[in-house]
Amino acid sequence: VTGVTESVGDSRDDLMAVAQDPTGALFASGHAGPGSPFSEPMGLIRSDDAGRAWSEISLGGEADFHSLAADGTAIAGWATTGALLWSEDEGDSWLPGPVTTAYSVALFMEQLWLAIPDVGLATWNRDANAIEPVGEEGVLLATADDGSAMWRVGPDGSVHRTLNGREWRQAGSVGAAEAIAASRNSAFIVTATGVQRLQVGG
């Protein structure tokens, strides 16, 4: 992908994770930059104007989320304090999940999906508060902006998409990936050399 980048808003905070829910609200976390009004670490912050202005929601000075997911009903995040956290009130309060380490989290088909070291891809059975491996590998996860698909990047850089959580279609390979964002038919993946776009039909 080629083009020109441009700053949004005046913030110089170091955002480590960003998620968007179906209403367009952005949720983020990371480290406070110079002149920032936020705590360090930032906890969960929110923007309702596409990232121009942000407000603190919770966990300021406590949590540094490195992966976040939001679907309009729940927010899930993995924090570097070693906590998987779950909220059903837009981040005002949190419940702990069953793992202490996760590469990435995603919300898809009303389920929390996790990419976990030494486990691979798994879902969270909330009733039993336990993870259930699904037999696939993954280090990065992303749900399409309209919730219609989920993408995963494997440890070998292979990229797959699912529309139902069971059947996966390979879209390509990118090598070592650092971040991913997706729509139903496209994934944008950040690597050490730039941003790559993969597309798949259907």
Whereabouts are the PLM-identified features?
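Extracellular glycan-interacting surfaces
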Residues: 1-202
